[in-house]
Amino acid sequence: MILLGVSISPFVRKVLVMAAEKGIPLEHRQLSPTTSEDPLFLAASPFRKVPVLIDDDYHLADSTAIVAYLEARFPQTPMFPTDPRERGTATWYEEVADTIIFPAGQKIFFNRVVLPRFLNRPGDLATAAEAQATLLPPVYNYLEKVVPVEGFLVGGSLSIADICVTSMLVNMHFCDAAVEPALHPRLAAYFKRISARPSFARLIAGDKAMLAA
């Protein structure tokens, strides 16, 4: 199987981490959705969404669809709880990550990292600062209340909930909007704990090197 998409995307990271945790072999090909003219990518993702999964003659775009497919295709080491309530809660956190955390952080990451680093354009630093001051604190305040002192967001093992939330928080650490232990100690400890897992740590190290190059 092949996964297309740039690893700095939290949605690509989400799939790569899940695959690593489940032991699914994936060939990852770095690809920018805004500039790529790869015919395989364009055929599989007409709206230029990443990541894109290529599984023989089956193509699938969008991280939520991909992780659901991978869970069904490779049920070993489940990342979605089997208990109905826990599964519902895990799906809720996936939705929070995609529709609440990502929009809050995107203005910061896009203006401080994507525009200057990848598109050779100056970012709107005032917009980034305003987003950090107004949009991010409610997100961090909420997560501070719900993350556990030890363990995982849902149930007794790593789940898609932890993968999705942490994948988004990684990008905040890349754009000077990291969780501050003095303000959000539980969230900071949770992030440190989950992001230290080999599935995350390897990707984070690679992205740091890419951003520093």
Model-identified regions with their sequence ranges:
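GST-like fold's C-terminal all-alpha helical module
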Residues: 99-196
